[in-house]
Structure formats: C-alpha cells, structure tokens
C-alpha cells in the first residue's frame, strides 16, 4: 500500500522473499497464496514466481467441485495479474485482475485486506491508460464512502489527466477539506487525553 502511495519501501520485499520462497507450493489458503506470489514478484524473484504460477495452475486443475470457480475465476487470473503488475505490464495486470475482481469476496480475508487487490487493480488501470475503467471504480468508491480523502485525491489526479480541470480542482478542494477535518479531530482528541 505504501508503494502505491509513492513511498519507497527499500529492501523490504527482498527481506520477505526469504520467508515466502519455501511456501511456493504450500497452497493452504488461496488468500495467502496470492499475497505470497505478489511478495515474490515485487522482490524480483522471477523463477519463484514462475514456479508458483505453475503450481497454482496445477492446484486449480485439481480443485474440488466446490472450489473450482474460486481457483479458475479468481485465484489464477489474480495471481497472473499481480505478477504482471509487479513486472510493469499494466495492461495485462488490468485485464487479468479485472477478470478476478467479481470473485474476490470468495477468496476470503477482510474487506480491508481485499481492498489491497482493488488498489493494485486501480493502479494498473490508471498506469495502462484505461482511464474510463479507473474513473468508474473511483466514482463508485466515492459514492460508497464519500468521506475518504485518498479517493478524492485519486479522482483529482485522474481528472487532471483527462483534462477535466474544474472537476480536478473540486476534488482537490474536497480532499483538503476532509484532511483538515481529520487533522483537527486528531488534535482535539490529543488535547482531551
């Protein structure tokens, strides 16, 4: 999440890879598998990523009837999309992750945990230039949770790219108002303690 917001995370991915490599064929949880795969991909562990993708495809082929849809429609395309994102192939990432997104809930995890995949998908859409799809997602997010400054900032950036200056400025203003409100609330809470 930090990298998606422009923060340099240094060698943290490489540090994680040490713990992730032994889990390439584990498959105890599809939810964990896709996280492991993304960590390996971000660490640049190409051979481990290739091995894990093949192992995930094999696991999908052996899925029991009740889990076939999860593996075929969510896990495999999501894993390939995450690998593509880490490799910088944003069009492939956007396409494959887009296939998986409708099935994401069946993967498990909390809403906040699954939101990471939504953020990566949105990043892929934006960086691939699929602005209409990115805009639709951001507008839906804004309707669902209108008080999130980060969504307003993302909308502002996209509106700027689309040449919609008036909408961009409005979104920037709303983001700043929300951020100011949150900072004041934190200050008041700190003073009360």
Report residues per predicted region.
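Helix-coil-helix junctions within alpha-helical repeat/solenoid scaffolds
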Residues: 1-193
